A protein has these predicted regions:
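Extracellular/periplasmic, surface-exposed regions of secreted and cell-surface proteins
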Residues: 1-105, 246-277
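Active/binding-pocket-proximal capping segment
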Residues: 15-20, 28-30, 196-200, 207-211
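Flexible, solvent-exposed coil segments and beta strand-coil junctions
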Residues: 25-35, 155-162, 232-245
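Conserved small-residue
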Residues: 38, 55-169
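C-terminal extracellular loops and terminal segments
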Residues: 40, 44, 86-101, 168-180, ...
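Subset of outer-membrane beta-barrel
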Residues: 57-62, 174-206, 268
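Exposed, low-structure sequence patches enriched in small/polar residues
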Residues: 108-109, 123, 180-182, 193, ...
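Extracytoplasmic gating/loop element in the C-terminal half of outer-membrane beta-barrel translocons
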Residues: 197-277
Length: 277
């Protein structure tokens, strides 16, 4: 503590290794089933947690104190089954966090008469076939039309397949912070808490137009694609995602988590009312 106990806190660093995790893993279907529960895998967590407490103002009748918290954690899969292979079914990848989004990368929205270069391939709209074709006449992205999500060809073969999926981001934040304040004035207490989450990748349900239904998503105010509004930010309302892919966004946000106002009734008033503490 410092400044006559007006400032205090602590810093914790940690490294945690966990092995023999009970997880469901896939096995060849020839066994009669395709998954079993097994003690497999190793993970490593490391991070830092910081807490600071301060007395900002203190007089006879007034006190204002604050508490600040910061937490950063990094986890990764060290080993799965001991063979060095990833588990695509469960979306587990060696060297990556346990909870990740694994999907196609959306580069934008297909436009009418679209034509672009990617990984040495030329992709263009064929009006006769109503398809986007590569230079060999192969369909680049099955079912794609103007207003569809434009997916990235990651492996460079000139067409979209399951091999083009990638790790989009972590489901857990890069770091979190919170700031709490408590103000006391005589018998009154007022407190509030802010929470902050930074660097988390979220699935954007608002972009999944095929799921629009009463009470779920609404199109009001959404800048969706139409021939008259050829936006590159959102697909058309009739778009059905290829291979059930979805949309993601890396987010940071701060929220007011809690507000409390309290009053401590003096014992003298309680006694007059016949109430004992």
């Amino acid at each position: 503590s410092f400044l006559n106990n007006r400032l205090s806190g602590n810093i914790d660093f940690y490294v945690s290794n966990t092995s023999d995790l009970l997880m469901k893993r896939t096995v060849p279907i020839m066994n009669g089933y395709n998954s079993i529960m097994d003690n497999v895998g190793k993970t490593r967590n490391k991070g830092v947690e910081i807490t600071l407490n301060s007395v900002n103002v203190e007089t006879k009748d007034f006190r204002w104190g604050s508490t600040f918290n910061f937490a950063l954690n990094r986890d990764k899969i060290v080993e799965l089954r001991g063979d060095g292979n990833d588990d695509l079914t469960n979306k587990w990848f060696i060297g990556e966090p346990v909870k990740v989004h694994y999907d196609y990368n959306v580069m934008g929205t297909w436009q009418e008469n679209d034509r672009f270069e990617l990984n040495g391939h030329t992709i263009a709209w064929d009006a006769a076939q109503k398809k986007y074709l590569n230079e060999d006449g192969e369909e680049y992205q099955k079912g794609a039309a103007p207003g569809s999500a434009k997916l990235e060809d990651r492996d460079g073969d000139g067409k979209i397949t399951a091999k083009d999926k990638m790790i989009i981001g972590s489901k857990l934040p890069s770091f979190t912070m919170s700031l709490g304040n408590t103000i006391n004035y005589k018998d009154f207490t007022f407190s509030f808490l802010f929470n902050g989450v930074f660097g988390v990748t979220k699935e954007m349900q608002d972009y999944n137009f095929e799921r629009w239904s009463l009470g779920y998503n609404y199109i009001d105010g959404m800048d969706y694609w139409t021939p008259e509004n050829p936006t590159n930010e959102m697909t058309s309302p009739g778009y059905v995602p290829y291979d059930k892919h979805t949309f993601y966004k890396k987010m940071n946000y701060v929220q007011l988590k809690n507000i409390t106002l309290g009053y401590n009734i003096p014992q003298s008033l309680l006694s007059k009312a016949g109430i004992a503490a």
